[in-house]
Amino acid sequence: MVDTHKLADDVLQLLDNRIEDNYRVCVILVGSPGSGKSTIAEELCQIINEKYHTFLSEHPNVIEVNDRLKPMVNLVDSLKTLQPNKVAEMIENQGLFKDHVEDVNFQPVKYSALTSNNEECTAVVARGGTANAIRIAAVDNPVNVNKLAQDSINIAQIVPMDGFHLSRRCLDLFKDPQTAHKRRGSPSTFDSNNFLQLCKILAKTSLCKVSSHHKFYSTSSVFEKLSKTFSQTIPDIFVPGFNHALKDPTPDQYCISKFTRIVILEGLYLLYDQENWKKIYKTLADTGALLVYKIDIDYEATEERVAKRHLQSGLVTTIAEGREKFRSNDLLNGRDIDNHLIKVDNIVHIRND
């Protein structure tokens, strides 16, 4: 079993080490289907946030949110703006770029939009269209810390790769839609274009620095340091999740807020050495604030886990069908991950049998 408390300590130590140079740190957590990566990511996130809530309960009124950010960055200034007529055309086509659904070289574009909470934002879309959109909220109204419940302030946030599954209507437009649906979960059935763009955005925010008029000492805790270095000018970033009942992405399910100092990215292909996936590691590693974990587990153990999950999700009607679905798709994806793992030295391998 994975010691998630030890992982939490390692992540907080990285944040402490990098807090003068990085606004946030990232964690990559990769594993084959059924390896337990989602559960581990959720536990890790919960442990870190609970530790911070305990600190806040013992240190009331410690949080400061200031605007001393260096450098001031436009997170998507390099992206082309999608013109209104093209936005209308995309929406008319069910939020898709019909000619680009399989184009892994399609460059993400941006346009003005609204979040699901009706906040003004910049939407970033790629070959998966609006189903896999990233939405960056406008930075307008200053945060009033006094009006925030302290247990609502979370410094860690998970970002599952699942939200970047191409929608079923997107797969319908593939040259071979039958195979695309059958092999859903393989690398080509995710919007790798926009997930890489998300990593580029996160890297830019990571490299921002917030100065503080407080003098920190060697005895200052990491929670004390980060509590004095929240920034008003870091925007909220909304990313999609995945609804297993609807079998499609759901917009704005996760929010990487200005309080998020640890982003835990989990998924199958974040260390994959092909197409857009191969650029993710370097994009985040170049910030100097990244931890990378690969979960190793025997396929015999994952078969039963995944078969039961398929049955519970309604994808199959019997456990035997679940096992067959695992062998014809999930097992192939797991082996693909192992065969195409990027070759870098700092991947920490952990067992979860």
Swiss-Prot record:
Any one GO MF term held by the record is:
ATP binding
As given in the record, the signal peptide range reads: none
- Quote the record's binding site residues for ATP: G31, S32, P33, G34, S35, G36, K37, S38, T39
Q: What Enzyme Commission number does this protein have?
A: 2.7.1.-
**Which InterPro entries does this chain map to?**
P-loop_NTPase
What are the protein's UniProt keywords? Answer: ATP-binding, Kinase, Nucleotide-binding, Transferase
Q: Which SUPFAM superfamilies match?
A: P-loop containing nucleoside triphosphate hydrolases
Top enzyme class: transferase
Asked if the record carries the keyword Repressor, the reply is no
Q: What function does the entry list?
A: ATP-dependent kinase that could be involved in endoplasmic reticulum membrane assembly.
Q: Which PANTHER family match?
A: URIDINE KINASE
Q: Which family does it belong to?
A: Belongs to the YFH7 family.
Miscellaneous notes for this chain? Present with 161 molecules/cell in log phase SD medium.
Q: What is this protein called?
A: ATP-dependent kinase YFH7
Species assigned in the record: Saccharomyces cerevisiae (strain ATCC 204508 / S288c) (Baker's yeast)
